[in-house]
Swiss-Prot record:
Protein known as: Spermidine synthase 1
Keywords: Polyamine biosynthesis, Spermidine biosynthesis, Transferase
Record's signal peptide: none
GO biological process: spermidine biosynthetic process
Binding annotation for S-adenosyl 3-(methylsulfanyl)propylamine: Q75, Q106, D130, E150, D181, G182, D200
Gene transcribed to yield this protein: SPDSYN1
Lineage of the species this protein comes from: Eukaryota, Viridiplantae, Streptophyta, Embryophyta, Tracheophyta
CDD domains: AdoMet_MTases
Length: 334
C-alpha cells in the first residue's frame, strides 16, 4: 500500500482565484433562481458554462444528479453526475474536468514536458488539486520527488471522494502536498531545484493574470535546473489568440532554450480544445516535438491504468498548428 502524501499548510493568498467578471450557471425550465451559495438550480436541468472569455456561446451538459455543492474559502465547488460525460467537477461555475475526457488534458500537460527530457527526477505541480497530473507524473519511474502546491484543500478532499481514479495520484509516496499559494511557493523554492514545473492554472483574467506574465515565468525559470522544462495551460487558439501572443512574448524574453505552443482536444472545454506553452531554460537543448523519454511500458501503472490519450505520435502532432495560429506565433519571435 502506498504511503499517504506528506501535507504542508499555508495561509498565503490563492493561486486559483474567483473570476469576478464571470457569469456562470445553469439553465433550467423549472427554476433560474440563484441559490444561497451562488449556484443556480440544476435539478433537473442543464449546466451551462458562460463567460466573457468566450462571448456569444455556451457549453451545456445534462445534469442527472448533483453529488456535492460547497463553498470553500476561495471558490464555489460543485460535482454532478452528467448524462454523457460521467461525473463533472465545477469550480466557480467553470468546468474543470469530466470523467470522460479528463485524460486528454491530464496526460498531455504532463507527458509533453516529461517525455521531452531524459530521466526527470524532481517535478513541481502548481494547482492540479484534483490529482490527475500527479497520477500521470507518477507513471515516470525516474521521478523521485513530486511537489504539488494547491490553494484549496476542499478541491483535494472533494476529488478524493468523488474522483478516486483521478485523485489516486495523491497516494504515491513520492508526493508532498502543500496547501497554499503556488506563486509564493515557487518564489521560495531554491534556485535550480526542479527538472520540470507543470502549471495547471485557471484562465488569465482578474488576479490570475499574474500567472501568465513575465515575473511569474521568471520565478519558474529560477526554480528550474539548466535545461529544465515548464508546461502551462495556454488557452484556445480559436478564442484567445491575443492572449497566446502575449504569453509567447513573455516566455521568449525569459526562457533562453526552446519555446513552443502545443494543443489538444478536450470536448468540454470552450471551443473543444486547450493549448499548452512549453519552454526550457538555457542548458542542455530540448526538442519538445520529438520525445526522448518514453513512458516505461513495464511501469506498474500501465497495467492497471493504461494511457487513454497520449502516445508518441500524438506528442509530435500536438505541435502542428493551423496556418493562422502558426503565423501569429511566428510574428512574435523577434
Amino acid at each position: 500500500m502506498a504511503a499517504p502524501e506528506n501535507t504542508l499548510h499555508s495561509t498565503d493568498s490563492p493561486l486559483k482565484r474567483q473570476r469576478e467578471d464571470e457569469v456562470n450557471g445553469v439553465s433550467d425550465t423549472l427554476s433560474k433562481e440563484p441559490q444561497p451559495n451562488g449556484l443556480s438550480s440544476v435539478i433537473p436541468g442543464w449546466f451551462s458554462e458562460i463567460s466573457p472569455m468566450w462571448p456569444g456561446e455556451a457549453h451545456s451538459l445534462k445534469v442527472e444528479k448533483i453529488l456535492f455543492q460547497g463553498k470553500s474559502d476561495y471558490q464555489d465547488v460543485m460535482v454532478f453526475q452528467s448524462a454523457t460525460y460521467g461525473k463533472v467537477l465545477i469550480l466557480d461555475g467553470v468546468i474543470q474536468l469530466t470523467e470522460r475526457d479528463e485524460c486528454a488534458y491530464q496526460e498531455m500537460i504532463t507527458h509533453l514536458p516529461l517525455c521531452s527530457i531524459p530521466n526527470p527526477k524532481k517535478v513541481l505541480v502548481i494547482g492540479g488539486g484534483d490529482g490527475g497530473v500527479l497520477r500521470e507524473v507518477a507513471r515516470h519511474s525516474s521521478v523521485e520527488k513530486i511537489d504539488i502546491c494547491e490553494i484549496d484543500k476542499m478541491v483535494v478532499d472533494v476529488s478524493k471522494e468523488y474522483f478516486p481514479d483521478i485523485a489516486v495520484g495523491f497516494a504515491d509516496p513520492r508526493v508532498t502536498l502543500n496547501i497554499g499559494d503556488g506563486v509564493a511557493f515557487l518564489k521560495a523554492a531554491p534556485e535550480g531545484t526542479y527538472d520540470a514545473v507543470i502549471v495547471d492554472s485557471s484562465d488569465p483574467i482578474g488576479p490570475a493574470q499574474e500567472l501568465f506574465e513575465k515575473p511569474f515565468f521568471e520565478s519558474v525559470a529560477r526554480a528550474l535546473r539548466p535545461g529544465g522544462v515548464v508546461c502551462t495551460q495556454a488557452e484556445s487558439i480559436w478564442l484567445h489568440m491575443h492572449i497566446i501572443e502575449d504569453i509567447v512574448v513573455n516566455c521568449r524574453q525569459v526562457f533562453k532554450g526552446s519555446v513552443n505552443y502545443a494543443w489538444t482536444t478536450v470536448p468540454t472545454y470552450p471551443s473543444g480544445m486547450i493549448g499548452f506553452m512549453l519552454c526550457s531554460t538555457e542548458g542542455p537543448s530540448v526538442d519538445f516535438k520529438h520525445p526522448v523519454n518514453p513512458i516505461d511500458e513495464n511501469d506498474s501503472q500501465q497495467a492497471a491504468r493504461p494511457l487513454k490519450f497520449y502516445n508518441r505520435e500524438i506528442h509530435s502532432a500536438a505541435f502542428c498548428l493551423p496556418s493562422f495560429a502558426k503565423r501569429a506565433i511566428a510574428s512574435k519571435e523577434n
